[in-house]
Amino acid sequence: MHIKNLTDGYTCSAQISKDELKHLHEQGVKSVICFRPDGEHPEQPEFDTLTREASELGLVCYYLPYDVAQVSAELMQQMHRIIEEAPKPAHAFCK
């Protein structure tokens, strides 16, 4: 997993796995934000699967799936709200 540090307390990467959730937890991440729609790729774990694993680790999960064709001011406001309220450090992932 290649993690990019975007700001203090906020990182991102491509799709994560259940094992990578454990790694993020070990690194001190407190919340995970998923911007990827379920079913985008056959090998992609469903968000519910990741949520169950994350909950067992004590991570807070947020789900705001979108397609780039659907980007709007409303979506950006929702994204901003989630990023602001998510316990830090937070990690977001997409495709």
What residues fall within each predicted segment?
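Cys-dependent protein tyrosine phosphatase-like superfamily
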Residues: M1-H91
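Short cysteine clusters
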Residues: C94
